[in-house]
């Protein structure tokens, strides 16, 4: 007599997709990508500030302190603009991603991938030999 349930090693349709190890891997990957992006943004901002200070230190120092003519310093204005710009960028990408997700009517990343493959043409894969650097860089 056959059983209707899944055997060992098989998954039923009612179970949550993916094992806990897969979910943990995705969470770790998301944390890694988020921290790498944050580190890149911070490095870019610090590099830009140090370059501005190196280029003209007297103007940089004038911009760090508020005066009677300027009630807000230039650096605090720049930080506020960076914060609002980052917020708008994150929210904008999230809204666009959510709108595309809902417009396509997909429920998982596998559905999204198959939908994208059906919409866009396939990318041809050439197995030709790679060009040699001597050939590419050779003068006429």
Swiss-Prot record:
Protein's UniProt name: Transmembrane protein 242
Quaternary structure annotation from Swiss-Prot or TrEMBL: Interacts with the core subunits NDUFAF1, ECSIT and ACAD9 of the MCIA complex. Interacts with ATP5MC3, NDUFC2, TMEM70, MT-ND2 AND MT-ND3.
Disordered as annotated region, ranges: 1-20
Compartment(s) of residence: Mitochondrion inner membrane
Organism of provenance: Mus musculus (Mouse)
InterPro entries assigned: TMEM242
Main location: mitochondrion
Family recorded in the similarity comment: Belongs to the TMEM242 family.
């Amino acid at each position: 007599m056959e059983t209707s349930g899944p055997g060992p090693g098989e998954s039923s349709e009612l179970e949550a997709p993916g094992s806990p190890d897969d979910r943990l891997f995705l969470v770790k990957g998301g944390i890694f990508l988020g921290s790498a992006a944050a580190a890149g943004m911070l490095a870019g901002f610090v590099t830009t500030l140090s370059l501005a200070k190196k280029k003209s230190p007297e103007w940089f120092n004038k911009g760090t302190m508020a005066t009677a003519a300027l009630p807000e310093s230039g650096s605090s204005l720049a930080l506020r603009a960076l914060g609002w710009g980052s917020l708008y960028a994150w929210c904008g990408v999230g809204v666009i991603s959510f709108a595309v997700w809902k417009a396509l009517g997909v429920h998982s990343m596998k559905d999204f991938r198959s939908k994208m493959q059906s919409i866009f043409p396939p990318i041809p894969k050439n197995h030709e030999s790679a060009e040699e650097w001597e050939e590419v860089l050779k003068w006429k």
